Amino acid sequence: MPVAYTFPVLPSSCLLCGISNRSTSFVVDRPELQISGLLVVRSESGEFFGSGLSLRRFQREGRRRLNAAGGGIHVVDNAPSRTSSLAASTSTIELPVTCYQLIGVSEQAEKDEVVKSVINLKKTDAEEGYTMEAAAARQDLLMDVRDKLLFESEYAGNLKEKIAPKSPLRIPWAWLPGALCLLQEVGQEKLVLDIGRAALRNLDSKPYIHDIFLSMALAECAIAKAAFEVNKVSQGFEALARAQSFLKSKVTLGKLALLTQIEESLEELAPPCTLDLLGLPRTPENAERRRGAIAALRELLRQGLSVEASCQIQDWPCFLSQAISRLLATEIVDLLPWDDLAITRKNKKSLESHNQRVVIDFNCFYMVLLGHIAVGFSGKQNETINKAKTICECLIASEGVDLKFEEAFCSFLLKQGSEAEALEKLKQLESNSDSAVRNSILGKESRSTSATPSLEAWLMESVLANFPDTRGCSPSLANFFRAEKKYPENKKMGSPSIMNHKTNQRPLSTTQFVNSSQHLYTAVEQLTPTDLQSPVVSAKNNDETSASMPSVQLKRNLGVHKNKIWDEWLSQSSLIGRVSVVALLGCTVFFSLKLSGIRSGRLQSMPISVSARPHSESDSFLWKTESGNFRKNLDSVNRNGIVGNIKVLIDMLKMHCGEHPDALYLKSSGQSATSLSHSASELHKRPMDTEEAEELVRQWENVKAEALGPTHQVYSLSEVLDESMLVQWQTLAQTAEAKSCYWRFVLLHLEVLQAHIFEDGIAGEAAEIEALLEEAAELVDESQPKNAKYYSTYKIRYILKKQEDGLWKFCQSDIQIQK
């Protein structure tokens, strides 16, 4: 009695858990169907027999099935054929795989291994969610692959003769879901994602989108599991987020239990993923993820501090101490309204105070205190130091811990106490057991009590050295008081203020912070990458299909501006301006002011010259754009001389903000700092303290990042700028805000080359600072699928004037590209 083989659909195991964003070439055409039919049966003796028929022969024979019995071959009329469905379809697709890959065996596998693998796959049930058509396609494909490997050497290859197995494989479109199902089951996740993304670009994929998305979601789950196994939590989290986006993109997939399981897993993984992302190197590539992690940490803290909200974190002291240890001092200060929380903590009988002690223990709050002192001292920010003093007073009242020295030190910095008082408190601290408590918090060994106490030594060892952004700051108290400035709180010297990642708001007050109605994004949404692209990519010249496909991109910002941006950009005049800005983005022309004709120590200004050619790829100022027509547009713009006209630059600025802001300011200002330095060279100069000059430049860089950043703090420009520089930068920042775009800046390196102070007969005292800056930035525009990025190393000369209140303000600048 012969044994007939039927192969039911088999699943892939859902592993609830990689990142795979590859793209591969994918060929789809529609030749006449030429498929060989091959049927394999096994006799009672266990031997396999095969017979092949072409599709045309099957049609002539009336779709008859061969069956082997007793060594003879009999024809059974009107029996169903697994190839019958192919006759109705002439659309085929090429898969970049071999038959061996489809069943999960190596190319060296013997025939018995092939049969065993097929039998094992046959016994496995399909994953929940696949359609019946996908199950049938999987069965047909599985049997077809087995037959080809057993009886057709072209597909099996020959190891001895070094003949590779045939690839790619051409199959009907109806078999694609079955192929993806098999590939996912045998562990070919990356192939599933590559083939799935490529297939979605073709119109023929429309009937199979449900099964394609499901296969891709399961592949991402498998990748996530592999990432978790090697402790790559953030990669696994992002893979799960991708799987979630695939399932949410199709209504029929949203009903699966798999989606619920993924969402629950993401909630549980939010805390460890936050720690993992905070531990990433502080590079421009990781800046976006780090901002998301900080926003997620803020949201987790909000949930923990809220009496009504629930949170996944069980051991708060352990979690929060690890998180704080991975933050910069400025990030700690901007994370929460710490002084308000400290005041709430004083009322020991309140429910909020009790709940806060569970979430934020004394050790964490002490590190927060040191962070405030570090930021306040390094940036000479009296308001931040005053907050540190408030925290001291509240912790003394609520915890009963002796923090008299820290309080006295803050009073000394605020000129509310003497150095002698602070030094006396330090001596008392060194001589009692409280110093051991502090050292244990900081993870330091106890210092010998015989050493002479020093405020500067304590400041360096116990405060500044604890945070990466203040570690290199000088602990000199003399410098602090010599050039003391009272900057507003938002002038951080290490990095721009940390805003709410989604809503672009500053940290809220305590009442607002614990009010869940003020927060529309969960920690999971904060951690989800903003660049999750829709898996549905329309085919070329198929806008109609693109419009009908669902988008699964996960938005982070609710403030998506839809005020006819596309109408503006697609208008003729705006399009010309857009092309012009792209040319500027693409590293074209800066106004380099040539200094020549140096006679008797005088600098004479040269006419502004504009280069008519784009910079080469080796130029240090390199814009990265995803536009395929960038080079073509750039050449066209340069030939027409659009970038050579200052008025046109101003008009383009009103249309869109897309260029390195320093360069755009210089062009639109129509004035160079050289004109002022000309007169300065004739006057008596005296050196300016390098640290003070560096501090001023850093202050300006931070203000620039805030004014052109997501919060558009245009008002802050007037605190550091004056004259024409203020007008031009205000125009630029206001235009960016009006166009709903903003810049993200990362200052990588700053070096003051020279700094001088001179007397200006008209304006009083003025200064000239020449600095070398290394900077990276990203232009964020919600209307564009990709953000323009640049990396630049440039030398810049600033002219500053001293105001009546004793503060310096930048008036003019002259930027030069470094080759």
From Swiss-Prot:
TM stretches of this protein: 573-593
Regions annotated as coiled coil: 419-439, 762-782
Source species: Arabidopsis thaliana (Mouse-ear cress)
Stromal membrane side: 77-572
Subunit structure: Self-interacts. Interacts (via N-terminus) with ARC3 (via MORN domains). Binds (via N-terminus) to FTSZ2 proteins, FTSZ2-1 and FTSZ2-2. Recruited ARC3 to the middle of the plastid where subsequent complex made of CDP1/PARC6, ARC3 and FtsZ proteins can form; this complex enhances the dynamics of Z rings during chloroplast division. Interacts (via C-terminus) with PDV1 (via C-terminus). Interacts with MIND1.
Record's keyword terms, sorted: Chloroplast, Coiled coil, Membrane, Plastid, Plastid inner membrane, Transit peptide, Transmembrane, Transmembrane helix
Tissue: Exclusively expressed in young green tissues such as young cotyledons, shoot apex, emerging leaves and budding inflorescence.
Disruption phenotype: Defects of chloroplast and FtsZ filament morphology (e.g. long FtsZ filaments formed by multiple rings or spirals); elongated chloroplasts with multiple division sites. Aberrant stromule biogenesis in the leaf epidermis associated with giant and pleomorphic amoeboid chloroplasts, typically having one or more constrictions as well as one or more extremely long stromules. Reduced number of enlarged etioplasts in cotyledons associated with the formation of multiple FtsZ-rings.
Ranges of the Chloroplast intermembrane topological domain: 594-819
InterPro entries linked: ARC6-like, ARC6-like_IMS
PANTHER family, A to Z: PLASTID DIVISION PROTEIN CDP1, CHLOROPLASTIC, PLASTID DIVISION PROTEIN CDP1, CHLOROPLASTIC-RELATED
Physiological role: Component of the plastid division machinery required for PDV1 localization to constriction sites. Involved in chloroplast division site placement. Required for the proper formation of FtsZ rings at the division site in nongreen plastids (e.g. etioplasts). Inhibits FtsZ assembly, functioning as an antagonistic regulator of FtsZ dynamics against ARC6, by recruiting ARC3 to the middle of the plastid to facilitate its interaction with FtsZ proteins. Required during stromule biogenesis in the leaf epidermis, especially in non-mesophyll cells plastids.
One GO term of the biological process aspect: chloroplast fission
Compartment(s): Plastid, Chloroplast inner membrane
GO annotations of cellular component type: chloroplast; chloroplast inner membrane; plastid inner membrane
Membrane topology: Single-pass membrane protein
Phenotype upon changing D112N: In parc6-2; reduced number of heterogeneous chloroplasts
Name of protein: Plastid division protein CDP1, chloroplastic
Transit peptide start and end: 1-76
Primary localisation category: plastid
